[in-house]
């Protein structure tokens, strides 16, 4: 779920608050359209698409689905998720959090004008 995703981000990117990712580019945060502005925004587009795939699983609601995972020294592991939805959503969030850690953060792409840059 989104709370766990926030915690995963704090695991892989401990030196930057999770809310820096909540309104970044065209895809990080609510909704998403246009072309990603950079590598970090592409991480978010991929995460959005992953959630869309998760929603195709019967009764799977990725924004609120809880799952089990471990964070150890910046390494994330999804664990003990017997149900398909939990395992899928955990992996969506894990892959995105790792992607965030590897992508440059460009301050100019925070809080962009969606109408101007995301058509």
From Swiss-Prot:
Gene3D superfamilies given in the database record: Phospholipase A2 domain
InterPro entries listed in its UniProt record: PLipase_A2, PLipase_A2_Asp_AS, PLipase_A2_dom, PLipase_A2_dom_sf, PLipase_A2_His_AS
Compartments, as annotated in UniProt: Secreted
PROSITE patterns linked: PA2_ASP (PS00119), PA2_HIS (PS00118)
Function (record text): PLA2 catalyzes the calcium-dependent hydrolysis of the 2-acyl groups in 3-sn-phosphoglycerides.
Gene Ontology MF terms in the entry: calcium ion binding; calcium-dependent phospholipase A2 activity; phospholipid binding; signaling receptor binding
Protein name: Acidic phospholipase A2 CM-II
Cofactor field: Ca(2+)
Catalytic machinery residues: 47, 93
Family note: Belongs to the phospholipase A2 family. Group I subfamily. D49 sub-subfamily.
Cofactor note: Binds 1 Ca(2+) ion.
EC top class named in words: hydrolase
Known EC number: 3.1.1.4
Pfam families tied to this protein: Phospholip_A2_1 (PF00068)
The entry's keywords: Calcium, Disulfide bond, Hydrolase, Lipid degradation, Lipid metabolism, Metal-binding, Secreted
Swiss-Prot/TrEMBL GO biological process terms: arachidonate secretion; fatty acid biosynthetic process; lipid catabolic process; phospholipid metabolic process; positive regulation of fibroblast proliferation
Reactions mediated catalytically: a 1,2-diacyl-sn-glycero-3-phosphocholine + H2O = a 1-acyl-sn-glycero-3-phosphocholine + a fatty acid + H(+)
């Amino acid at each position: 779920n989104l709370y766990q995703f926030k915690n995963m981000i704090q695991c892989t990117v401990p030196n930057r608050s999770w809310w820096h990712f909540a309104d970044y580019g065209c895809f990080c945060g609510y909704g998403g359209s246009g072309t990603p502005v950079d590598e970090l925004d592409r991480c978010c587009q991929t995460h959005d698409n992953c959630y869309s795939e998760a929603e195709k699983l019967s009764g799977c609601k990725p924004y609120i689905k809880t799952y089990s995972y471990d964070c150890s020294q910046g390494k994330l592991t999804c664990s003990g998720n017997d149900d398909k939805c939990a395992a899928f959503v955990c992996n969506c969030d894990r892959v995105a959090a790792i992607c965030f850690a590897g992508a440059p953060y460009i301050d100019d792409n925070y809080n962009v004008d969606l109408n101007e840059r995301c058509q």
